[in-house]
Swiss-Prot record:
The EC number(s) this enzyme carries: 2.4.1.182
Family, per entry: Belongs to the LpxB family.
Organism: Thiobacillus denitrificans (strain ATCC 25259 / T1)
Gene Ontology MF term list: lipid-A-disaccharide synthase activity; phospholipid binding
Biological processes per GO annotation: lipid A biosynthetic process
Pathway: Bacterial outer membrane biogenesis; LPS lipid A biosynthesis
GO CC aspect terms: membrane
Protein name per its UniProtKB record: Lipid-A-disaccharide synthase
A Pfam family annotated for this UniProt entry: LpxB
Enzyme class: transferase
Organism domain of life: Bacteria
InterPro entries tied to this protein: Glyco_trans_19
Length: 372
């Protein structure tokens, strides 16, 4: 198994737990994060090594990434696993999967890259690399079927894990927060994302605080290194801020509004039925390249799935403290708009809640049996 960054680690843990239910003696090893390790996966390398994004950052880390991929490829070719599972991290995994598939190892890829949003030409590379694609959004299934790639729609594991009714009161009690308005700030799990978004979000929080004196802020840090950078970003700011060690789901359950860096966390916020502002910043060169290849007007998963701007997006030069603060204040001041959005997000949640564990186990079972 190979997973990249925090979201892949979480999905990888759910994936392996699903497989173990009917195969308690099953073992797995590869590139894994702490949640996968807790689920029983042996980490040959930590998944944080793959947590880089954007053309500029990838180029900076390219020698190490290529070295790790060469080493892990040799390891799997030598050990000959019954099945290989790549979880997200497509640019890393597809080359590895292609080598293993050529050697006769079945390759399962969990979570399709967003070929429907940009770089659709990747479908040909996927065809060479992947024995079976497991997709988490219903519209993705037809894309792979039309391309002649075996595919199963399994639903999204997070939709199964997150309750249909957000436990707001319990989360606030656990975190020691009061009854006043709470705004969650989620700058991203990668350190580069924290560097680009933490100060931006905190400055926006200062402006919100100036208009709403009783508001409090909660910010989950994905790692100790992220927590240290957040502390530096918050220096000199007088904010009622609670920084958490992880616990992003509790932060989202507790909040009234969230400011979220684009990524899986936007889907999590939607599953918790929370109004949000989606933001993202990347280096200017990366932004120019991505805009040229983009197929959709949205970047956030809630908007992509709704095919509409149901929540605001503030990207690149539009991502300013003024804009984020105005969006947060607009959500806080409009209960009817918040209630209407919750109805939209409830329907989305029910669509994605498919019992992913059972579907994953059923899709991969033939490959495990054939390799016995």
């Amino acid at each position: 198994m190979v997973a990249g960054e925090a979201s892949g680690d979480l999905l990888g843990a759910h994936f392996f737990d699903a497989l173990k239910k009917n195969r308690p003696g099953l073992t797995a090893a590869g590139i894994a994060g702490p949640r996968m390790v807790e689920a029983g996966v042996k980490a040959i390398y930590p998944s944080e090594k793959l947590a880089v994004n954007g053309y500029v950052e990838v180029l900076r880390h390219l020698p190490e990434l290529l070295w790790i991929r060469a080493r892990i490829t040799r390891h799997f070719l030598r050990e000959r696993p019954r099945v290989f599972v790549g979880i997200d991290a497509p640019d890393f995994n597809f080359t590895l999967e292609a080598a293993l598939k050529r050697a006769g190892v079945p390759t399962i890829h969990f979570v399709s890259p967003s070929i429907w949003a940009w770089r659709p030409e990747r479908i040909e590379r996927i065809k060479q690399a992947v024995s079976h694609m497991l997709v988490v959004f219903p519209f993705e299934e037809a894309i792979y079927r039309d391309a002649g790639i075996p595919v199963s729609y399994v639903g999204h594991p997070l939709a199964d894990v997150i309750p249909l009714q957000a436990p707001t009161g319990a989360a606030r009690a656990t975190l020691g927060l009061g009854d006043g308005p709470i705004v969650a700030l989620l700058p991203g799990s990668r350190l580069s994302e924290v560097d680009r978004h933490a100060r931006l979000m905190l400055e926006a929080a200062m402006q919100v605080r100036a208009k709403e004196m009783d508001v409090r802020f909660v910010l989950p840090a994905a790692s100790e290194a992220a927590r240290e950078r957040i502390a530096r970003a918050a220096q000199g700011l007088d904010l009622p801020l609670t920084v958490l060690a992880g616990r992003s789901h509790q932060a989202l359950a507790a909040c009234d509004v969230a400011v979220v860096a684009s990524g899986t966390a936007t889907l999590e916020a939607a599953l918790f039925k929370k109004p949000m502002v989606i933001t993202y910043r990347v280096p200017a060169l990366t932004a120019r390249l991505m805009r040229k290849k983009a197929l959709l007007p949205w970047i956030g998963l809630p908007n992509i799935l709704a095919r509409d701007f149901v929540v605001p997006e503030r990207v690149q030069e539009a991502a300013t403290p003024d804009a984020l603060a105005a969006d947060v204040l607009a959500w806080l001041g409009d209960a009817a708009r918040r209630a209407a959005l919750a109805v939209t997000f409830d329907a989305l949640h029910r669509d994605l809640r498919q019992g992913a564990s059972a579907r994953i186990a059923a899709a991969i079972a033939p490959y495990l049996e054939a390799a016995r």
